[in-house]
Structures are given as C-alpha cells and as structure tokens.
Amino acid sequence: MEAIKGSDVNVPDAVFAWLLDGRGGVKPLEDNDVIDSQHPCWLHLNYTHPDSARWLASTPLLPNNVRDALAGESSRPRVSRMGEGTLITLRCINGSTDERPDQLVAMRLYMDERFIVSTRQRKVLALDDVVSDLQEGTGPVDCGGWLVDVCDALTDHASEFIEELHDKIIDLEDNLLDQQIPPRGFLALLRKQLIVMRRYMAPQRDVYARLASERLPWMSDDHRRRMQDIADRLGRGLDEIDACIARTGIMADEIAQVMQESLARRTYTMSLMAMVFLPSTFLTGLFGVNLGGIPGGGWRFGFSLFCILLVVLIGGVTLWLHRSKWL
C-alpha cells in the first residue's frame, strides 16, 4: 500500500492525531510525516465538530460507504471488511451503576495497516488506558496491537461494570433475607442496565470472535489469539449477565411476596381489632339510641358499671381469640 502524507490527515479540530513510532510510543502528527505500516497514524475525531465532519465527507482516504458510518449512522457493534480496510463499531461503558442505562458510548473506527480513524461524540473513557500506555512508551507498536489493546480496555471496563452490578444484586439479596425492601425503581433500574448490557455486549462478543478468526493482513497470530481470549472473557461476562437477570426476576417475585405478606398481616391485624371492638361498639350504639332514655342514666354508678362491662366484654373476646389461636 502507498504511504500517506501527514498533511492528508491534518484535521484542525481533531481530538488528537498521533503517529505511532513502532516502539510503543507516539508523537504528534506533522504535515511532513510519512504514514506507512511501520509508522501508522491514529486520528481520533469528534464527528460533531465542523472540520472533522468536512474531512470525513471529503477525504479520498475513506471509502464512500464508510463515511456515513463514521459520522454516527452506525450504533450496534459490528465489523465489516471494506477492501483493504475494516470498519468496526464498538460500545464502551461510561458512568457508574447509579446512572440510567444510557452510558454505553459508541465508538466507530476504520483502519488498515497504515492508519486508524476513530470517531465518537461523547468521550470514550476506556481509551484513556490506551492513550496512557502510548504516552508512557508501553503501548501498541502497530495497528493490530492497537486494536487488541482497545478491545481489551473496553472489555475491562465492561467486566468492572458487570461486577459492580453483581455486587449490588448480592447486597439486595442479603437485604431481602432481612425483609428489607429496596427503594421503588431500584430493581427496575438494575434490571434495565443488565438488559441493555446484554443487548450490546452480545454482538460485541461476536465482533471480537470474528476479528480473531478473520485473516486480516495487519493482525498477527498472537493478535488473533489475544482477541479470542478477549472474546471468551466477554462471553463469561455475558453468562454472568444472564445469571444476574434471572436472579433479578426471582428477587422481583420475592419482593412481591414480602409486600403481599406484609399487607396480609396488616389486614389481619385490622380484622382482629374490629372483632375485639365490635361488641363494645354494638353496646355503645344501643345505649346511645336514647329513645326511651339512657338505661341507668339516673344512677350515679351507671356509667362506671357500663365501662366495667365494656372492659370485661373486650377481655372476653380477646381471650376467646387467643384460645382459638387467632392471636
């Protein structure tokens, strides 16, 4: 493949444009640099920036059917070979487990053995690990190593997020054993996050597996082996997600049962109170009719005797309920 001039990929508002030095480090790309397989270029763009959008729409370095995909038209993880290059769409985790499940950020990239063009709108936090390694001189030396390191960083972030969700489920299960109900919406958010993760990480695992099996010229056998390991690791994470989704379903049933039992206890208590006070209510209503005068109204001990009668009646009903094992 022909070499590319640095001026051909000069985008003023690029997030960064670096030239890999072939020894694990990078340097800022300059117009007189020569880009080839020994010194590939990494151009990282925000496709919403005007200069980046114009470059994506006009550069001859990109196939026509790649431009729309890099400009944000593609969202689900996938991989497509485009002649000598490859178009890859990946998803990564941004944010924490307390946020709504919209923290999956899309990253789109087109690459061959000479240069890498990656685009995003929101910042991709997983790339910070790769950027840090390159700045320290311990990063990838070629395009194949770069792709493996990026996929490894994305999977690390996904695995950490899945582990955090798993810990929350364990805490929730422990609380349910103590009859503690989680706040409203907590379990629904947790389940939604798991479902969204499952939706995007399953095709991403397939992307990794395909990259491991494709005979891409810029990926060595070691790169393919590492990529297969990454796919297997993400597959284990998906198995964990499936188990967590099943456990949230069981917890939802358990929460419903706990709430139903609590409501039944309250209803039972109110029914017993009604049974205890029903006879006394009947007597007070009967004596309060006052059609022929209140019985005992002219006797000074009448009210006291009536109160004693009510206490004895309530005690008798309570004793009967206790002997009947209703209390």
UniProtKB/Swiss-Prot annotation:
It catalyses: Zn(2+)(out) + H(+)(out) = Zn(2+)(in) + H(+)(in). Changing C244S: Contains three zinc binding sites, but the third site shows a decreased affinity for zinc. Coiled coil: none annotated. It is found in: Cell inner membrane. One of its GO terms (molecular function) is magnesium ion transmembrane transporter activity. Zn(2+) 1 binds at C92, H157. Disruption phenotype: Disruption of the gene has a marked effect on resistance levels to zinc and cadmium, but does not significantly alter the sensitivities to cobalt, nickel or manganese. Pfam families: CorA (PF01544). It comes from the Bacteria. Zn(2+) 2 binds at H166, C244. The chain crosses the membrane at residues 274-294, 301-321. The keyword Transferase does not apply. It is a multi-pass membrane protein. GO terms for cellular component: plasma membrane. Homopentamer. Can assemble pentamers in the absence of the transmembrane regions. NCBIfam families: PRK09546.1 (NF007092). Zinc transporter. Acts as a Zn(2+):proton symporter, which likely mediates zinc ion uptake. This is Zinc transport protein ZntB. It comes from Salmonella typhimurium (strain LT2 / SGSC1412 / ATCC 700720). The lineage of its organism: Bacteria, Pseudomonadati, Pseudomonadota, Gammaproteobacteria, Enterobacterales.
